[in-house]
Amino acid sequence: MKKIISTLTILAGSLAALPAQAAEGVQTIPQVTNEWRGAVTPYIWATTIGGSVAYEETKLASVDYRARDIISHINFAAMLTLEAHHGRLGAMADIVFAKLNAQKSEILGKPNLSSNTTVEQGIYTFAATYTIYNTKNTYLDGLAGVRVMNVVSRTDLKVADSVYGASNSNAKSSTAPIAGLKGRVRLGDSNYFIPFYIDVGGMAQGTQVTTQQMIGIGHAYEWGAATIGFKNLYNRQKSSGITTTQSLSGVVAGLSIRF
């Protein structure tokens, strides 16, 4: 919690130079109408990754990677939120995909052998939405949908100065239902607002719990909005007595383009 508060304090300060009064023609809070409306939001998520593996009550392994460590191994990444509404009904999708490539390294005690590991992870959230509450200062959607998580890993072994080698790949996928809330609250009469998101789900395909939260601060413009905040995703799965957890958290920044 202290980390989130500290992050948001710094982020809020970075927006302090923007105009405090509301500008004409700017829609800070979305309004329900009988026409189609929507937004496309590409964003950057500087996430850390933590996790653990346990058998029954015995912890077998744990990992903790900082954002700078992850960035140095990224081959490709895409992060995008899409949403569309007609009246109070709507739909949304949140897409996170990353391909990481570990540096080649010699295998201990085997100087003629080297390995290269590639990991692809996709986190896809799809939901139907319904606007529960809407005023000039507050917007609140309820949502229900699914979260799909895919992980594909591949390790290649190579014998130095030869064509010989071996490879092994593994793929895992899980789908779990989720439900939650999302929206924004306007700050006074300005174009500043607080965006928020929370969902929780699980109890399907071995997924015990999956939950995601985001809170931040944003500024609305005629074309859309700029937001910065803190995002966290937690997932716990259990199968055949083996429990795995994964936690992704970090600063998120995006530009939302309205249409």
Language-model features, listed with the residues they occupy:
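Cleavable N-terminal export/targeting peptides
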Residues: 1-35
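Short glycine/proline- and aromatic-enriched beta-strand/turn motifs that initiate or cap beta-hairpins
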Residues: 22-94
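Short loop/turn motifs that connect adjacent beta-strands in outer-membrane beta-barrel proteins
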Residues: 23-36, 133-140, 187-192, 222-223
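Residues that define the transmembrane beta-barrel architecture of outer-membrane proteins
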Residues: 34-36, 74-78, 120-124, 138, ...
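Residues on the lipid-exposed face of transmembrane beta-strands in outer-membrane beta-barrel proteins
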Residues: 40-42, 80-86, 126-130, 144-146, ...
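Transmembrane beta-strand segments that form the barrel wall of outer-membrane beta-barrel proteins
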Residues: 192-208, 232-234
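Predominantly the C-terminal beta-signal and adjacent terminal strand-loop region
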Residues: 209-259
